Design a protein with these regions (language model features):
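Assembly/oligomerization scaffold segments
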Residues: 14-197, 251, 371
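Short, solvent-exposed secondary-structure boundary/capping segments
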Residues: 168-183, 267, 411-429, 468-473, ...
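Extended, domain-scale alpha-helical bundle/helix-rich regions
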Residues: 172-173, 202-221, 226, 234-438
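Short alpha-helix capping/helix-loop boundary micro-motifs
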Residues: 126-136, 368-379, 502-508
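Short, Lys/Arg- and Gly-enriched loop/turn segments at beta-strand edges
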Residues: 154-163, 397-406, 415, 526-536
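A generic structural signal for residues embedded in beta-strands
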Residues: 148-149, 391-392, 518-521
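Structural signature for extended repeat/solenoid scaffolds and their inter-repeat hinge/linker regions
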Residues: 251, 258, 269, 452-697, ...
Length: 719
C-alpha cells in the first residue's frame, strides 16, 4: 500500500471515529429517556418495530453498544493506519520513523527532519512530528533516547540515535497534534556543566575519559595514531566540559565523529585520516535526485582558498631557559599560492620538543583544513563525517575515488504524514556535504584559551605533618579556592614557581612560602596553565608579627622555627626618638667578613655572654681606651705571650694580690726605677734610691751561705 493510501485510510479512520462518538452520544440520550427500559414500548411481542420506530430489533442499550463498537473499530483502524505509515508489514519507497523513550513505536509519525553534522561538532537533528495523542507527557520524552530511522523499501538506510534536548508541542488539529523535537548526541550533555578543575600528569585520552564518564558517556572509542604525551599541569577554568574538550582536542590535533549502532551513538576520537573507514559508493548522476530511490550525487563542485602557508610557534620553559623553543612547518603545495603567508604565535602552548613539533604541524593543518575542499549534494543519507564515500561514474576519472566527508546536512520531508498534507507530494530526501582528499589529515581550528582576569588568592599546601614543602626550584603546591577536587594536600596542584625579590645564578633572596600561608597568584599571559606566586598576604588566621596598629612603626623580617615555636628576626623600629635596629637569633649566629669590618658606636657598647667566649686573632690586635679601663675576672686569669711583653704606664701602676704571687724568670730579671725601689714585708724593708743608698731594716737578720761570704766597702762598721 502506498504512503498516500496509508494517510487516506488514517483520515477515514478518524472520520469513522468521530461518527462513532456522535452515535454513542445519541444512544446514551435515548437510553436515559426510556428510563433504561430500552425500546420495549415501541415493539410488539413479536419483536418487530412498530410503525415509526427504529429499524432493527435493538433497544436503546443495544444501540449504544453498537455505537461503542463502531468507536472502537475506528480507533483500531486509526492505529492500524498509523502503524502502516510508520513502516508496516508491506512498506515501499522512502520512509522516516521515530521512536522516543518508552513510548510506543506508533506514537509519532515523522513529517520532516533536518540533520546537521560535521567533524568535531555534536550533530543536531531537528524532527517535525505528528501524533494522535494531544497530550504527550514531556518527562516521557525529554532527556530520553530517541532514534530516527530512514528506510528505503523497508530496509534501513541509516539510523541516528541521540538524546532529546528539546521537545515542543504545537497546534492540535482535527485528528493530530504537531510536535517538534531536537535530538543531540550524548556528548552534548557536556555543554550543560561548567567547571573549574586541575588535571596533573595525565594525557588527553585520560582527561577525556574522566570527563565523559562523569556524564555517564561510555560509548567512546580512541583511534589515536600519534603520540600524545602527558601534560604536567592542565586546567579547566570557568568553561563548560564541552568547551574544555573542544579546546584540548584542537590543541592536540584530534578530531571526532559519531558512529551509530544498536540504538547508541559512539563518539570516535581520531588524529589521522587512516582512522576514517570506507563507507557508501555513490554514482554521479547530475540532476535532481531528491526523490530518486537510488542514492547518488547530483551536484559536485570544488574550491581552493588562500590560507597561511607556514606556521611558527615559540614558547619558553624555565627548566631550559637557553632552549630556543621554536618550531616551523610549511605547506607542501608550494605552487598553489605564495609561501610567505606566515602564522606566528607566542606562546605556543608547549614546554617540550615532542609537543612543540606536533602542535606546529597540527596548527598548520588546522589553518588549512578548508584550503582545498569539495561540495556535493544528492540524496544519500549515508554520507556522514567519519566515513569515506567513493564516487563513481564521473566523467573525470581522477574524481572517481574515495573522499573524506567533513560535514553534511540532510533534510527530509514526509508531508503526507500530516492530516493536511495529502496533496503536498511524496517523501523526499536531500543531502548537502563537503569533503576533502581521503588521505588529508583534517584538524579542528585552534580555539581561544580562557584568560584569568587578574591575580588570585591561594593557600600553600603539602603532605600531612610537614610545614615546608618545595622542590629543587623552590616551587610549592597550592590549593585554589575554585578547585573543588583538590584535597589541600601535596597533590592539590602541580609545582608552582614563586617569585623572589632577587634571583641570580646561585645568589639572590629566597623565602619559601610555608604550608598554610596565603599567597597571591598571577598567571603568565593570563594562562590558567601557567600560575606563578607573586606575593603573600596576612588574614584573620595568619596575623602579622607585633601588635597592630600599636607596632605600625616597626618593619620586621621574622621567620618561624620549623616545627617549633621560635623565630629569627630582623626588626626596624622607626618611631621618632626610639629608632632601633634589633637582631634576634633563635639559636646560633654566624658572621663572616672576607675583608675589613668597621664598627662605630657613638655612645655606649655593652656585650653580655652567658657562657664562654673565644677570641682568635691571627694577626695583630690593638686596643685603645681613651679614659679608664676596668677588667674584672671572677676566677682565674691567664695571659700567655709568645715573645716579648711590654707594659708602659704613664703615671702610676698598682698591683694587689690577695694571697700568693710567683714570678719565674728563666734568665735575668731587671727592675729599674728612676728614684726609689722599696720592698716591704711587715716590719722588714729594703729600700734603694737613685743616690746609691740601700737601706735594709728588720728586727732580725740571718745570713746563710753554702760558700764564702765577702763584704767589700770603703768603711765597714759593725756595731
Amino acid at each position: 500500500m502506498s504512503m498516500k493510501k496509508h494517510l487516506t485510510k488514517l483520515q477515514q479512520g478518524h472520520a469513522l471515529l468521530e461518527k462513532g462518538k456522535q452515535a454513542g452520544d445519541l444512544a446514551k440520550q435515548a437510553t436515559n429517556l426510556l428510563g433504561g427500559a430500552g425500546t420495549a414500548g415501541m415493539m410488539d411481542k413479536g419483536g418487530l418495530m412498530k410503525p415509526g420506530g427504529f429499524a432493527g430489533p435493538l433497544g436503546g442499550q443495544g444501540l449504544a453498544q453498537q455505537a461503542a463498537a463502531g468507536h472502537s473499530g475506528a480507533a483500531k483502524a486509526l492505529q492500524k493506519a498509523g502503524q502502516q505509515l510508520m513502516g508496516g508489514s508491506t512498506p515501499s519507497g522512502l520512509q522516516f520513523t521515530l521512536t522516543a523513550g518508552e513510548l510506543a513505536p506508533e506514537t509519532f509519525v515523522v513529517t520532516d527532519f533536518t540533520l546537521t553534522e560535521g567533524f568535531s561538532q555534536p550533530f543536531s537533528l531537528s524532527v517535525g512530528l505528528a501524533s494522535a495523542d494531544p497530550a504527550i507527557d514531556f518527562p516521557a520524552v525529554l532527556d530520553r533516547a530517541a532514534t530516527l530511522t530512514i528506510l528505503q523499501d523497508g530496509v534501513e538506510s541509516r539510523s541516528i540515535t541521540g538524546m532529546v534536548a528539546r521537545f515542543e508541542q504545537g497546534d492540535t488539529g482535527l485528528h493530530q497534534t504537531t510536535y517538534q523535537m531536537t535530538i543531540r548526541p550524548d556528548l552534548w550533555r557536556t555543554t550543560l556543566r561548567q567547571n573549574s578543575r586541575i588535571f596533573q600528569q595525565q594525557d588527553i585520552e585520560t582527561i577525556i575519559t574522566t570527563i565523559l564518564k562523569e556524564h555517564n558517556i561510555r560509548d567512546v572509542v580512541f583511534s589515536l595514531r600519534h603520540p600524545h604525551p602527558e601534560r604536567e599541569f592542565c586546567v579547566q577554568y570557568q568553561e563548560s566540559d564541552f568547551a574544555f574538550l573542544q579546546r584540548l582536542t584542537a590543541e592536540e590535533g584530534i578530531f571526532y565523529f559519531f558512529e551509530y549502532s544498536n540504538g547508541r551513538n559512539t563518539v570516535v576520537f581520531a588524529d589521522d585520516s587512516g582512522s576514517v573507514p570506507l563507507g557508501i559508493v555513490l554514482p554521479y548522476q547530475p540532476g535532481d535526485t531528491s526523490t530518486i530511490g537510488e542514492p547518488a550525487v547530483s551536484h559536485m563542485t570544488s574550491s581552493a582558498q588562500v590560507r597561511p602557508a607556514q606556521v611558527e610557534l615559540k614558547d619558553y620553559t624555565f627548566k631550559n631557559p637557553a632552549w630556543s623553543a621554536e618550531f616551523k612547518e610549511k605547506m607542501k603545495e608550494d605552487t598553489l599560492q605564495e609561501m610567505y603567508y606566515e602564522h606566528y604565535d607566542y606562546p605556543g602552548r608547549f614546554k617540550d620538543e615532542v609537543h612543540g613539533k606536533a602542535f606546529t604541524r597540527y596548527r598548520l593543518e588546522a589553518l588549512r583544513n578548508d584550503a582545498m575542499t569539495g561540495q556535493g549534494s544528492g540524496n544519500a543519507i549515508a554520507v556522514q563525517p567519519g566515513k569515506l564515500f567513493t564516487l563513481t561514474n564521473h566523467p573525470r576519472a581522477d574524481l572517481n575515488q574515495p573522499w573524506q566527508v567533513v560535514s553534511a546536512s540532510h533534510s527530509g520531508s514526509q508531508p503526507q504524514a500530516r492530516e493536511t498534507g495529502s496533496g503536498e507530494g511524496g517523501t523526499t530526501l536531500h543531502s548537502d556535504f563537503s569533503f576533502i582528499q581521503h588521505n588529508q589529515n583534517w584538524r579542528p581550528s585552534p580555539l581561544p584559551k580562557p584568560v584569568v582576569d587578574g591575580p588570585q588568592i591561594a593557600k600553600v599546601v603539602g603532605p600531612a605533618g610537614e610545614e615546608i614543602f618545595c622542590d629543587q626550584y623552590g616551587r610549592v603546591r597550592l590549593q585554589f579556592p575554585w578547585d573543588r577536587y583538590g584535597q589541600s594536600n601535596d597533590q592539590s596542584s602541580c609545582w608552582i614557581r614563586v617569585t623572589q625579590p632577587w634571583a641570580g645564578q646561585g645568589w639572590g633572596m629566597l623565602a619559601i612560602p610555608r604550608i598554610g600561608q596565603e599567597v597571591v597568584v598571577d598567571f603568565l599571559h593570563g594562562d590558567p596553565d601557567q600560575p606563578i606566586v607573586t606575593g603573600r598576604t596576612y588574614h584573620a588566621s595568619n596575623i602579622p608579627p607585633g601588635g597592630l596598629p600599636g607596632s605600625k612603626t616597626q618593619m620586621a623580617f621574622r621567620s618561624k622555627t620549623h616545627k617549633g615555636e621560635g623565630y629569627n628576626e630582623l626588626l626596624f623600629e622607626d618611631a621618632k626618638g626610639s629608632e632601633q635596629l634589633s637582631l634576634h637569633a633563635q639559636k646560633d649566629m654566624n658572621t663572616k667578613v672576607l675583608n675589613n669590618r668597621d664598627t662605630k658606636v657613638l655612645a655606649n657598647h655593652t656585650e653580655t655572654v652567658d657562657k664562654n667566649q673565644t677570641l682568635h686573632i691571627k694577626g695583630h690586635q690593638m686596643s685603645t681606651v681613651n679614659l679608664t679601663r676596668t677588667d674584672t675576672v671572677g676566677l682565674g686569669y691567664a695571659l700567655t705571650v709568645g715573645a716579648a711583653m711590654n707594659t708602659a704606664v704613664a703615671l702610676s701602676q698598682s698591683e694587689q694580690v690577695g694571697v700568693h704571687k710567683s714570678v719565674i724568670v728563666g734568665n735575668t730579671l731587671s727592675i729599674t726605677a728612676g728614684d726609689v725601689i722599696e720592698l716591704k714585708c711587715g716590719a722588714s724593708t729594703l729600700r734603694m734610691d737613685s743616690s746609691g743608698k740601700i737601706t735594709i731594716q728588720g728586727t732580725e737578720f740571718k745570713f746563710e751561705a753554702s760558700g764564702p761570704v765577702q763584704i767589700t766597702g770603703k768603711d765597714i762598721d759593725l756595731n
